[in-house]
Amino acid sequence: MSSADDQTTTTSSELRADIRRLGDLLGETLVRQEGPELLDLVEKVRRLTREDGEAAAELLRGTELETAAKLVRAFSTYFHLANVTEQVHRGRELRTKRAAEGGLLARTADRLKDADPEHLRATVKNLNVRPVFTAHPTEAARRSVLNKLRRIAALLETPVIEADRRRYDTRLAENIDLVWQTDELRVVRPEPADEARNAIYYLDELHAGAVGDVLEDLTAELERVGVQLPDDTRPLTFGTWIGGDRDGNPNVTPEVTWDVLILQHEHGINDALELIDELRGFLSNSIRYTGATEELLTSLGTDLERLPEISPRYKRLNAEEPYRLKATCIRQKLENTKQRLAKGTAHQPGRDYLGTGELLHDLKLIQTSLREHRGGLFADGRMDRTIRTLAAFGLQLATMDVREHADAHHYALGQLFDRLGEESWRYADMPRDYRGKLLAKELRSRRPLAPSPAPLDAAGAKTLGVFHTVKRALAVFGPEVIESYIISMCQGADDVFAAAVLAREAGLLDLHAGWAKIGIVPLLETTDELKAADTILEDMLSDPSYRRLVALRGDVQEVMLGYSDSSKFGGITTSQWEIHRAQRRLRDVAHRYGVRLRLFHGRGGTVGRGGGPSHDAILAQPWGTLEGEIKVTEQGEVISDKYLVPSLARENLELTVAATLQASALHTAPRQSDEALARWDAAMDVVSDAAHSAYRRLVEDPDLPTYFLASTPVDQLADLHLGSRPSRRPGSGVSLDGLRAIPWVFGWTQSRQIVPGWFGVGSGLKALREAGLDTVLDEMHEQWHFFRNFLSNVEMTLAKTDLRIARHYVDTLVPDHLKHVFATIEAEHELTVREVLRITGGEKLLDTHPVLQQTFAIRDAYLDPISYLQVALLKRQRDAAAADTPPDPLLARALLLTVNGVAAGLRNTG
């Protein structure tokens, strides 16, 4: 199967050669597995698509279903192979750049020489970057396919001499054969435990290599510029929503949460055991030649008394090797911890570990003793790497966030308050301000609100039960296992206080006794809440009881910003602008109350859901909003794109850590004058208002819901079994309001319209230009990181959008009376392209990124046939449904294969 690269020239001849090599091997697989006729048809379709799209569409329209399915699979497999090859070469290019210019952390450290030394030390002390893995249904590729692609990546990454090429090509061909013979469609919808295994797959790999490399380099580069990374600082940790995100997912029960935590710990402890076994191999230091601290020897004696499992023979063999013997005791405690969790027995101090802190304490005894007995090189090298890696993952691998909808808390509390009968209002009828005061008063109270068990119906008991599960988890697994409780659709301080009251009822906090085991996190996810962000935080922190809770959590308040829903309801321009402004306002309120703000960015994979290059996005944050800490969601196909190839995993983690460090240490004051910032803010208000109006006109068109369903395959999303979470909110019917942001983006992306990633931007920019502010636009693009980053992401999405293909969807699938919606989309697209090019100065989109521009052009030769087939199959399916013909399983299967194929070709689903 030849490559479309043959028709082009790119800057990377090696990349072209590798894609051609895999394309040829795929062609051999097709002949070997299906016969030469399939390969001939693939080449004919690809050639015809390039020469005459309509002729290609006509040919595919009459293709038999079985052949159509094979065609789609051939093109999709090509994309999987091309994607993994590009990932390998991206990693290779980054390594070449590292060799020539030094690593990104080294370059960042050089910039830090200009930072205020005291502020830099404080930033480094607080440094914590936390990618949070979520299970949102956007990863279309099955793990079975991803495993094989990872093996292909490993083969491509290995330098091969000519004498070995035949053997490596055989290994590649074997894996391509296996990909072809693997069903890429899920037979059943995954359970949360299956989703957890997917995330754990990547976390295990990161544990084994990339994270240790990043932390070791970070420590060394900071030391080079005179900054010590404190021993107790965790610059990199990981989070997860899998098993903890209950909002709209009835499959996440307290029992499921527990099962996922057990699964994470099984892997986390096994990963820790591998590192400890490695240490035992190194730590042969004899007490005859080195000595050891009294503290280490005392702890070793205590361990040996408490751990009779360690055989006398082993004690005798290692009697003069206290470091190795201590590592053996650590290993036994880890084994005991694993057994305790499996059996559900109680923690035995000194025999097993309750949380990561006890493990790290034991390891630091070894490290300190080595430092004091001429073992500093190993103590500050391999030993430090091991300790920091274990601190990054903990025994839990990733700290779980728990999330629930604000209404669920109020529903439970309504039953408890109404039962008391002390208020003149029914709880559900209370105005928000009144309810907030009632809950704040209750938070101050010493008495419990309800007896135990609380008199609640099934739904209320389930909500309170989650808090009890969190309490139990902290008691069994340790304090790092769950740290944040997130309230989705948070609209006011009362929503935060409600969760805090339920946490108190479950024994998770006691303001009078002075402890709080979890933090409460508001999630602001619509435009209205983003605009009110400062008011909401002010109302929270001005209440003495809640301020006390924050103090007990280290004077840190986490706030999550939702990109997906704000974009769906307000359009991308208003969403991005209001999130940017909300961060400024939140920063000012937090500073006023002496609180450190931790922002949690709920980004999706696509630009329409807040996606885009992480490094640029972090550097574009407002000044002072990063104080060394950031949390960012990693969703769906973004996880495999960033972490499937080990070299890329390292670079992506390095990018995020470096950007956070740089922005926190150096961006402590405005880069612009107050006058310039005021001018740009006013300009962005004009852009946002006009863009919002254009977007709302589109989504409020009464014909849009029917048009959206007609012109996209969004109804097929549920059949793909991408995730455990339903694509619609409960009881939402067929309205767009009830459709989650992910399928909203999914549908537009599949039909190549990608409306959420750009619609309204042209109207906004035009409004500013017509106001005579062309020069301000140019100034913003040249000098304002936020605006330049925003426009760059929009330009990339416009380049992925293909209204020529979209028109084929509309002409074939959409009734005539709805086609005016597409006319609106076409007009706004033309306007947006024109306005963006006026600012960038290019003749075509991505003129400043010729390699990316060419990559998109190359992919179209393979992507367009899949889109043509998708349209033809959708037409067949809908015609059959209209004629009451029984569903054809082969037709449904072929259609779902096209959905996977487009996702692979665009490297995005939702």
UniProtKB/Swiss-Prot annotation:
Q: Which Pfam families does the record match to this protein?
A: PEPcase (PF00311)
Write down the EC number. Answer: 4.1.1.31
Enzyme class per UniProt:
lyase
The Swiss-Prot or TrEMBL record annotates one GO molecular function as:
magnesium ion binding
User: Which GO terms fall under biological process for this protein?
Assistant: carbon fixation; oxaloacetate metabolic process; tricarboxylic acid cycle
Active site, renumbered: H136, K568
Its cofactor is: Mg(2+)
> So what does this thing catalyse?
oxaloacetate + phosphate = phosphoenolpyruvate + hydrogencarbonate
* InterPro entries listed in its UniProt record: PEP_COase, PEP_COase_bac/pln-type, PEP_COase_Lys_AS, PEPCASE_His_AS, Pyrv/PenolPyrv_kinase-like_dom
Regions crossing the membrane:
none
Which keywords are on file for this protein?
Carbon dioxide fixation, Lyase, Magnesium
**Does the record carry Cell inner membrane as a key word?**
no
- Of which family is this protein a member? Belongs to the PEPCase type 1 family.
Stated role: Forms oxaloacetate, a four-carbon dicarboxylic acid source for the tricarboxylic acid cycle.
Name of the protein this chain belongs to: Phosphoenolpyruvate carboxylase
**Organism per entry:** Streptomyces avermitilis (strain ATCC 31267 / DSM 46492 / JCM 5070 / NBRC 14893 / NCIMB 12804 / NRRL 8165 / MA-4680)
Taxonomic placement: Bacteria, Bacillati, Actinomycetota, Actinomycetes, Kitasatosporales
